[in-house]
């Protein structure tokens, strides 16, 4: 019976890690889709799914990351600090690019948001 519980826990952790990876790629894809639309002058805000799904995906990405962090009991390691810093940069750059207050968004903020996000993904992959 103990083996079954351990095996199920292991499967749950593996599923959580795969969900985290899925949400990372989904968040990146949604960033690129909204960014491309914004750069081409398309109103992505008129598409309800593109207004809601990025927030949901990013939230589930962060929550799954925190749960993984708790389950694996990571200390404060360099790669974790770097991922957190890149996550903050991604949020700042994306917020500047997608701000409603700016009539003509600067594409550099979009590219910096993409680089920050991909950098965080690469750190996770290469650590």
UniProtKB/Swiss-Prot annotation:
The keyword Membrane applies. It is a multi-pass membrane protein. The keyword Cell inner membrane applies. The chain crosses the membrane at residues 13-33, 61-81, 82-102, 107-127. It comes from the Bacteria. InterPro entries: SirB. This is Protein HI_1253. One of its GO terms (cellular component) is plasma membrane. It is found in: Cell inner membrane. PANTHER family: PROTEIN YCHQ (PTHR39594:SF1). Keywords: Cell inner membrane, Cell membrane, Membrane, Transmembrane, Transmembrane helix. Belongs to the SirB2 family. Its main location: membrane. It comes from Haemophilus influenzae (strain ATCC 51907 / DSM 11121 / KW20 / Rd).
């Amino acid at each position: 019976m103990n083996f079954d519980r351990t095996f199920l826990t292991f499967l749950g952790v593996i599923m959580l890690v795969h969900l985290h990876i899925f949400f990372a790629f989904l968040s990146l894809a949604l960033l690129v889709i909204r960014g491309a639309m914004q750069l081409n002058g398309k109103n992505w805000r008129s598409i309800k799914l593109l207004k809601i799904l990025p927030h949901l995906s990013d939230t589930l990405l962060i929550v799954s990351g925190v749960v993984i962090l708790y389950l694996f009991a990571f200390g404060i390691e360099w790669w974790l600090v770097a991922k957190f810093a890149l996550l903050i940069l991604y949020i700042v750059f994306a917020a500047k690019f997608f701000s409603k207050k700016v009539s003509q968004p600067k594409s550099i903020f979009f590219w910096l948001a993409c680089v920050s996000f991909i950098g965080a993904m690469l750190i996770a992959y290469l650590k």
